[in-house]
């Protein structure tokens, strides 16, 4: 990478790690290693990111479920898909991945992908080669005869929260925490306004002592819980918070305005 310094404007990696790899913290270590090879002053992003489950025995249940959903599927052969994008847990896994990228020193992440209808395997254009990766399928009824595919999937709600309240130009704050598989936290500041996000992918509630650089001012708290919708409430205003993060949930505290 050093030989390309001054030629490359930004470094870009496409990554599809496994679930265990991300939730255990191992993928963050890989990101830190990649970032260390980027010349000082240059930036690196995950220009394409999602999850794939084959190859890791710890992810075998997810891989087997992927295969089961592909078999006899009415409008895709399942080639280059993630058939689990419909599921609630994926709505936690994707912001978890984004927050690991932040904490790993990366400057951005782009989720693959917005809409199933955007892309077919090999660019064939054939419905049976559809890549199911999106937040919805805008052509669900029109092309595939299934209007339910046009419904917004749970991970849209959490991903949009991360995009809105960790916007471009934010400064990522260093987060120091005890290692806990299935839990991550990230914080950022832009224009003097702070955001903090917590994700708990575990099946048990976690109690967290949150020590912020300063007290939050006029902050809002967003919570994402089952069955898969976001609720909004007034956030606590002090800088040292004792919080309970429910099982399988996301909590986001922000001073940024909801534009």
Regions found by a protein language model. Name each.
Residues 235-259:
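C-terminal beta-strand-rich structural cap/linker in extracellular carbohydrate-active enzymes
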Residues 51-160, 164, 170-183:
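Aromatic/acidic polysaccharide-binding cleft in carbohydrate-active enzymes
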Residues 178-215, 224, 248, 259:
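Carbohydrate-binding surface patches
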Residues 15-20, 49-54, 114-118, 202-203:
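Solvent-exposed loop/turn segments at secondary-structure junctions
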Residues 1-25, 107:
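Aromatic- and acid-rich polysaccharide-binding/catalytic face
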Residues 9-12, 43-48, 108-112, 195-198:
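Structural recognition of the beta-strand scaffold that forms the well-ordered cores
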Residues 222-238:
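Solvent-exposed beta-strand/loop surfaces of large extracellular or lumenal domains
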Residues 1-3, 25-33, 95-96, 180-183:
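Alpha-helical scaffolding within the catalytic cores
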């Amino acid at each position: 990478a050093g030989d390309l310094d001054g030629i490359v404007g930004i470094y870009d990696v496409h990554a599809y790690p496994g679930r265990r790899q991300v939730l255990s913290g191992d993928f963050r270590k890989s990101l830190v290693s990649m970032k260390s090879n980027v010349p000082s002053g240059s930036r690196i992003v995950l220009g394409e990111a999602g999850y794939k489950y084959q190859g890791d025995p710890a992810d075998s249940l997810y891989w087997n479920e992927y295969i089961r959903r592909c078999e006899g599927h009415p409008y895709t052969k399942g080639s280059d898909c993630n058939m689990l994008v419909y599921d609630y847990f994926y709505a936690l896994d994707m912001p978890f991945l984004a927050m690991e990228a932040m904490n790993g020193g990366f400057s951005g992440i782009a989720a693959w992908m917005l809409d199933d209808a955007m892309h077919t395997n090999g660019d064939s254009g054939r419905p049976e080669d559809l890549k199911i990766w999106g937040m919805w399928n805008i052509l669900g009824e029109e092309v595939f005869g299934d209007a339910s595919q046009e419904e917004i999937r749970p991970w849209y709600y959490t991903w949009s929260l991360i995009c809105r309240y960790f916007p471009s130009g934010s400064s990522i704050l260093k987060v120091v925490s005890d290692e806990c598989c299935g839990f991550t936290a990230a914080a950022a500041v832009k224009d003097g306004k702070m955001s903090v996000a917590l994700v708990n992918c575990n099946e048990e509630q976690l109690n967290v002592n949150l020590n912020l650089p300063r007290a939050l001012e006029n902050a809002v708290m967003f919570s994402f819980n089952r069955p898969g919708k976001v609720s909004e409430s007034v956030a606590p205003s002090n800088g040292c918070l004792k919080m309970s993060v429910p099982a399988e949930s996301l909590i986001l505290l922000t001073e940024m305005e909801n534009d």
